[in-house]
Amino acid sequence: MAQPLVKKDDDHDDELEYSPFMGIEKGAVLQEARVFNDPQVDPRRCSQVITKLLYLLNQGESFTKVEATEVFFSVTKLFQSKDTGLRRMVYLIIKELSPSSDEVIIVTSSLMKDMNSKIDMYRANAIRVLCRIIDGTLLTQIERYLKQAIVDKNPVVSSAALVSGLHLLKTNPEIVKRWSNEVQEGIQSRSALVQFHALALLHQIRQNDRLAVSKLVGSLTRGSVRSPLAQCLLIRYTSQVIRDMANHGQSGERPFYEFLESCLRHKAEMVILEAARAITELDGVTSRELTPAITVLQLFLSSPRPVLRFAAVRTLNKVAMTHPMAVTNCNIDMESLISDQNRSIATLAITTLLKTGNESSVERLMKQITNFMSDIADEFKIVVVDAIRSLCVKFPLKYRSLMTFLSNILREEGGFEYKRAIVDSIVTIIRDIPDAKESGLLHLCEFIEDCEFTYLSTQILHFLGIEGPNTSDPSKYIRYIYNRVHLENATVRAAAVSTLAKFGFMVESLKPRITVLLKRCIYDSDDEVRDRATLYLSVLGGDGTVDTDKESKDFLFGSLEVPLVNMETSLKNYEPSEEAFDINSVPKEVKSQPLAEKKAQGKKPTGLGAPPAAPASGFDGYERLLSSIPEFAAFGKLFKSSLPVELTEAETEYAVNVVKHIFDSHVVFQYNCTNTIPEQLLERVNVIVDASEAEEFSEVTSKALNSLPYDSPGQAFVVFEKPAGVPAVGKFSNTLTFVVKEVDPSTGEAEDDGVEDEYQLEDLEVVAGDYMVKVGVSNFRNAWESMDEEDERVDEYGLGQRESLGEAVKAVMDLLGMQTCEGTETIPLNARSHTCLLSGVYIGNVKVLVRAQFGMDSSKDIAMKLTVRAEDVSVAEAIHEIVASG
């Protein structure tokens, strides 16, 4: 029997709730299933048993083949019953049991009979079940019935056939594709649900044919879709067509944009919201295109229905990330939502306001946030904290009030992710705003006095060791750090010892005090703490052994000469023996990431994130990789890493691509190599680079790849020196050289002797755009006016004849390698003039803004007026030189 499940409630402590599934066991239910074999079927009792079986299956309970077969055969006997409710339960259990092909035959005749029944409910459910359990052979036998069902007058039957088609398309696409004519008729149905399912199926059938999808969208946008659900689907497909056309180089006015805009005037709210969302998510959407969508969303902000308010404010929140100025007109409406009873709406409203508000509204917003922070879940609090971090970077003069708010909520209750978000925000503020350093560090010190998370304590201690010694009074942090040695677990104590040592080395006046504290630590109960204390005392000279400053600095602050991931792997593989572990045996090359990892979407960087296990393919990953190689350590800070450039054709014996790493006076070519031949091992893999067409470059060094086994990517490097700060360009010829050794497939061992060989790669170019990092600005006009007008340089250029204005704009964008702003990369159809706004950071970390005005005459000759402003006038002149020579 079901057991009572007591549920506590603040207002009704005496209420009881009963769960009908409490205490259900598979064995007992299988015994009950014998009721299916009774001569006189009890529909109510049988339905209860089937419900229990469905519950067990959905809870992940596994049935053996014998158990499933027995239940299946017993259930088939229930087709004798005429009870409608029981018949529906029979359909469900057959679908869930998924009988094998030899068992399906037994139930097929019953289902076929139901599929041709006069009862529409039987027909619809029989179609759904049959399509779930049959294979391709049986499908061809019932295909005629399914086609008839698609165009059936009863919408329930028609929808069942269409939804079944969606499932069958995954396993039998060739058969389903033959139903296009019937599905096309379904789109003309007067039933909203049938039209919705028909459109979904027809799109799935044609999804791999870009032209067919475009034609489908074009035919339906003329007004033949009446179902709001189908209209929402059509809006999504239209957005995809617009994106595809943009990706394939079509410039000018967006196709189908007028359709999206017309949907904003639809009578169904779901269609209006879908259209508004689609417009806001268009690539490179302009302010003009956004305006009608923003206007509609603003009206929904004052809707009495919470779901509409939530949908509108969530969409506006996303828009505010890329086009904050477009959302400012909604600020008054969103301020009224801060006190909304729905905390999700209030959270989205406040975070949107934080992104769009001005400096004068910060104080008022912070007071309003304080009032509701305790009422929302941690996941929403994290969103608020992230918005505050962005706001502080945007308005650095307001750091005091924002830092105070963060420190207050840091002392409140909360989970690990929430606390980490706050700590990361404070760290970001400290790094970006020098004036905030001391107050921020003190807030972090107070937090670790009562921090329950070991990870956060160790990360904060590490950060204190880096930033604390450089403050005006480093001694005030010593008490907080040393308290951790007495009051925390071994991991935190070890981190505190390391932090103390850094203070002792960096601040000469503190060295005697630090030495005394470290001597106390050598009696700690944990061997890691004792070992660290002993080691640091030796480094600091506490035992009479004084290393040089350089050696001490390298030890305390330097990085290992080998990648951490390789060190970790080598230590795991090390087997204790009389021979000590040799760090020189750790390989210095880092394997390239698999393609799937490279494509994965990364999370945004945080202030105190743990280092990843392997270098990422992004800028930070490249920077870590290069800094781990001793030969490159003296090149300074990495300025830019390019996207990989393929140097081989697809499906060749060896796959090679190159990444260009730009330093102030060096360029490092990172050749990512993959051996695709299982029977070969490549050794001494190197790239010979001919720089005869790159006169300003001179080769400095190269780093070969010792071994390249099958399907195990590796990296070779070649370094060139160039004039410091100069955007030198040139073409490089590349030849891959290596020693080939045959591999025995049975043993996997390579032969001792190899043959030297080489493989010609494609040429590589270093262009002017490699010296520019794309960095956008949220408000181009303000950024432009903030730069000194005296550093402006203007000139005019003739770009010759072009097919279109868009071609000329793209050529200039590619040449300069800058980020387009405010959607100016989109050019109206048949436009004769256009202004493109560009921003970026030039080598040497110099901010650059460009206003390029294009004009085209009747003969398609294009002229350009280029206005450049930069923090350094010489950079503005360099941009003009690039254009003049390009």
Swiss-Prot record:
GO terms for molecular function: structural molecule activity. It is found in: Cytoplasm; Golgi apparatus membrane; Cytoplasmic vesicle, COPI-coated vesicle membrane. This is Coatomer subunit gamma. HEAT repeats lie at residues 66-103, 288-325, 327-359, 360-397, 472-509. SUPFAM superfamilies: ARM repeat (SSF48371), Clathrin adaptor appendage domain (SSF49348), Subdomain of clathrin and coatomer appendage domain (SSF55711). Keywords: Cytoplasm, Cytoplasmic vesicle, ER-Golgi transport, Golgi apparatus, Membrane, Protein transport, Repeat, Transport. InterPro entries: ARM-like, ARM-type_fold, Clathrin/coatomer_adapt-like_N, Clathrin_app_Ig-like_sf, Coatomer/calthrin_app_sub_C, Coatomer_g_Cpla, Coatomer_gsu, Coatomer_gsu_app_Ig-like_dom. Residues 592-613 are annotated as: Disordered. GO terms for cellular component: chloroplast; COPI vesicle coat; Golgi membrane; plasma membrane; plasmodesma. One of its GO terms (biological process) is intracellular protein transport. The coatomer is a cytosolic protein complex that binds to dilysine motifs and reversibly associates with Golgi non-clathrin-coated vesicles, which further mediate biosynthetic protein transport from the ER, via the Golgi up to the trans Golgi network. Coatomer complex is required for budding from Golgi membranes, and is essential for the retrograde Golgi-to-ER transport of dilysine-tagged proteins. It comes from the Eukaryota. It is a peripheral membrane protein. Belongs to the COPG family. Oligomeric complex that consists of at least the alpha, beta, beta', gamma, delta, epsilon and zeta subunits.
